[in-house]
Each structure stands twice: as C-alpha cells, then as structure tokens.
C-alpha cells in the first residue's frame, strides 16, 4: 500500500432499513433483545458458544456477550441510551475482534417513526482507528452489518 492509500480514511458504514414495526418495539428488539437476533457465529467467546448479547440500558453501561458457560466477554460501552429514538455504542473490539478498553469506534443507531413503521438509520464510524487495514476491513464489516440488520428486521417484525 502506498502512502496516499494509507492516508485515505475509510468511509463510515451507513445503512438505512425500514422495519414494519412500531418504533418502541424496534428500539426494544435492537437494544434489549440483541441476543435474539445477533448471529451466534459472530462471537468473541473462545471455547464456548454465544448464549446472549447484552446492552445495559443506560449511558455508561456495558455491551457484552454471555457465553453458554456463563462467561462474559466485553464488546464495548453504551455512550447514549435514549429510547425509543437513539442508541450510541462504543465498539471496543479491534480488527482482530479482541476487546481493548483503550480502543473505540462508534456505532450509532437512530430510530424514526414513519407511517406506522420504523426507519432505522445505522452508522459505524471512526473506522480509521482500525489502522492500516481499515479500508480492507470495511468491506467485510459492511457485509456483516448488512446481514445482522436483516436479522434484526426479521426479529422486530415477528414481535
């Protein structure tokens, strides 16, 4: 990679989806029931499978995974928790999906009520903090978030 390519910051991942569910339910499924829709293979637990994903419902709360063996694995922190409109999370997983309390990118999710449905505006930004490989990582993360948001949509529409 040349010097010019290294200076180009990767764009944020931005997604917008329409969910056929009221805003309160869409927010609740995203923030309180992440373990119901998060892909179980997208786990950082080693030696165990994923049982749940928890977002503590307050600014300053934890965002973490619970393994089937009861172990807890940090993913990040809750920066803003404003039901049913906005959720901001600090993603503290490095490009190797290792938790690092000194590392942070930002996941922001905004919920907009429109004609009895909910439009979800998703953004994962500050990806340049991933380092020299950030541009290459962006493609995989973009696809991963697209898949996860599809799973979220299906769960929210089921109720």
Question: For each predicted feature, which ranges?
Answer:
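Hydrophobic pocket/interface hotspot
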Residues: 26-30, 63, 78, 89, ...
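Short, solvent-exposed aromatic-acidic interface loops
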Residues: 92-96, 123-130
């Amino acid at each position: 990679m040349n010097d010019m390519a290294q200076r180009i910051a990767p764009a944020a991942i931005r997604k917008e989806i329409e969910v056929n569910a009221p805003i309160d339910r869409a927010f609740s499924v995203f923030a309180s029931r992440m373990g119901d829709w998060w892909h179980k293979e997208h786990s950082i637990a080693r030696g165990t499978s994923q049982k749940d994903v928890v977002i503590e419902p307050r600014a300053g709360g934890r965002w973490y995974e619970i393994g089937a063996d009861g172990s807890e694995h940090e993913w990040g922190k809750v920066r803003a928790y404003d039901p049913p409109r906005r959720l901001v999370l600090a993603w503290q997983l490095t490009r190797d999906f290792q938790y690092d309390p000194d590392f942070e990118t930002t996941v922001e999710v905004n919920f907009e009520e429109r004609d009895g449905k909910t439009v979800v505006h998703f953004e994962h930004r500050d990806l340049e903090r991933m380092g020299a490989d950030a541009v290459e990582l962006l493609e995989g993360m973009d696809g991963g978030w697209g898949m996860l948001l599809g799973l979220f949509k299906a769960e929210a529409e089921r109720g």
